[in-house]
């Protein structure tokens, strides 16, 4: 089963529109401050988002956050903006292709946000 999931997310899915499920919610329901964060994220990361919603508590500034199954990193990059320069966000994903895309755009987001506070790890949760 693990290999099937890796193949689906690593080889079959290329963009958000390729996702074959209705279990995930749309970004239309996100609050404005999250939508504003998404505007700062590279288009290629946003277009390859396969998440099932984002639950974010209040008061994240300066916190350390772990994103399990981070995929291409959109939630990590949203959280990066919310925790700020003194916080840290770590994303873990088992899919080489997904985590590779997250890392590919890490420098872009570091420069865009003005700080480096993200780490990506390829591994199992």
What are the roles of these predicted feature ranges?
Residues 3, 49, 53, 92, ...:
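Electropositive phosphate-/nucleotide-binding environments in soluble metabolic enzymes
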């Amino acid at each position: 089963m693990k290999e099937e999931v890796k193949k689906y997310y690593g080889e079959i899915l290329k963009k958000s529109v390729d996702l074959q499920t209705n279990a995930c919610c749309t970004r239309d329901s996100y609050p404005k401050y999250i939508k504003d964060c998404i505007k700062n994220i590279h288009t290629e990361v946003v277009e390859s988002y396969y998440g099932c919603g984002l639950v974010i508590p209040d008061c994240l500034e300066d916190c350390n956050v772990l994103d399990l199954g981070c995929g291409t990193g959109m939630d990590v990059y949203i959280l990066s903006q919310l925790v700020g320069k003194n916080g840290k966000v770590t994303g873990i994903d088992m899919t080489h292709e997904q985590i590779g895309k997250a890392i590919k755009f890490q420098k872009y987001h570091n420069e865009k946000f003005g700080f480096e506070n993200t780490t990506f790890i390829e591994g199992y949760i």
